[in-house]
């Protein structure tokens, strides 16, 4: 499914500038570039988008490339792992055939994680990984931070489309839906967040993001 004309107009005209230091599968290139157009801060960041069978409990995952963590932050690299298929109860669906808005929202959420990583030191990223593994409370807060980054950069409608797709899909397992409902922002939360951010100045929005990251660390520490 291709992007409609209005969506294409919203993509930065020079696609080549969005592709700098990026590796993107051709089949999802338009959706990835649309998501990247909302993150000018990542224009020079090395990010590799690739399909993998390694993901068992997620559709996508953003991870720093370990060997680059000893470099300066500007020289770090990240991977966004993508499951090639969307597993349903009785069938599978190629991920690139999911509705554009849904796929863009998924990618935008993972780019939100990279924005979070970019603000952390190497030790901070290691701590993030440990706490994410140990604490479900930390997972929820970390996912809220990623969604907040995306919403703050104008991706609210995409993030909402992704959440509604997951929670309303009749062929998705209830276990997966329960996990999403438990650990991630609900559609109502996203609508409320969009409304709040629209009322704030840019400086206030950035302060909200910083507060979200601090809350995630504080709550996780309290629960260890």
What are these regions (language model features)?
Residues 155-224:
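Long, well-structured alpha-helical subdomains associated
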Residues 139-156:
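An active-site-proximal "capping" alpha-helix that borders the catalytic cofactor pocket
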């Amino acid at each position: 499914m291709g992007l409609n004309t209005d969506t294409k107009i919203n993509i930065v005209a020079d696609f080549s500038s969005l592709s700098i230091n990026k590796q993107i599968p051709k089949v999802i290139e338009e959706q990835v570039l649309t998501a990247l157009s909302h993150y000018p801060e990542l224009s020079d960041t090395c990010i590799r988008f690739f399909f993998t069978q390694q993901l068992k409990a997620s559709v996508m995952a953003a991870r720093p490339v370990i060997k680059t963590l000893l470099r300066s932050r500007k020289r770090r690299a990240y991977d966004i792992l993508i499951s090639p298929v969307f597993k349903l109860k009785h069938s599978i669906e190629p991920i690139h055939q999911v509705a554009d808005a849904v796929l863009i929202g998924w990618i935008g959420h993972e780019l939100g994680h990279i924005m979070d990583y970019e603000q952390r030191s190497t030790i901070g990223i290691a701590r993030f990984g440990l706490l994410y593994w140990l604490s479900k409370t930390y997972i929820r807060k970390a996912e809220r931070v990623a969604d907040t980054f995306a919403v703050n950069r104008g991706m609210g409608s995409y993030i909402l489309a992704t959440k509604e797709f997951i929670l309303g899909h009749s062929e998705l397992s209830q276990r997966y839906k329960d996990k999403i409902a438990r650990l991630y922002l609900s559609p109502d939360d996203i609508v409320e967040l969009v409304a709040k951010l629209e009322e704030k100045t840019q400086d206030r929005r950035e302060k909200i993001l910083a507060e979200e990251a601090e809350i995630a660390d504080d709550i996780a520490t309290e629960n260890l």
